[in-house]
Amino acid sequence: PPSIDYGFNQLRDPNKYNVERAKELLKREGYEDTNGDGIVDKDGENLVLDFYAYTTRPELPLYAEALQADYKKIGVDLRIKIVDYAVIDTLAQSGDYDMIISSIVTANTGQPVWFLKQYWGTGVETNGSGFSNPRFDELLALGESSNDPVVRRNAVINAQQLMLDNAVALFLGYPKINIVG
């Protein structure tokens, strides 16, 4: 979050929204709309992705609908599946999904290494994404072990940038919550 100084404003996502580039990548992988139905296919099979969301965070189905509209622009049939959070958690840990949307407190301790390791660390049971990168793991270890706050901060920033560079996850937004008393 921007309230914790771990590079929020300096991180750069090289995978910005680009419909034409997405279409090029799909075509390069052999996906084209051969039957004119608006959905790209390969070997006669439409590209259909199941996208799991839950309603205990009311903004998540709205994000899912926005993504569904964007995916339609590139010819991908994104089917939204609304399930209980427990199902999302089970799917996320198993890796048995096409896409999941989740809203998680990313730095509830003020130290983001725990969060990054739990979801993307190599060999961690809760890493259902399958992401494994030795450099990422080294950066997390450095961010966890160093006594120097500058070294820890830079390690976390570099780990996050590595995630963005490798399109490990799609970060859609960061909600601002106000508490008024």
Give short role names for the model-derived ranges:
Residues P1-Q10, P14, E59-Q68, I88-G181:
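Detector for C-terminal structural segments
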Residues V19, K23-L25, E29, A53-L67:
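Bilobed "Venus flytrap"/periplasmic-binding protein-like clamshell domains
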Residues N46-T56, L78-K81, D98:
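Short, well-ordered beta-strand elements
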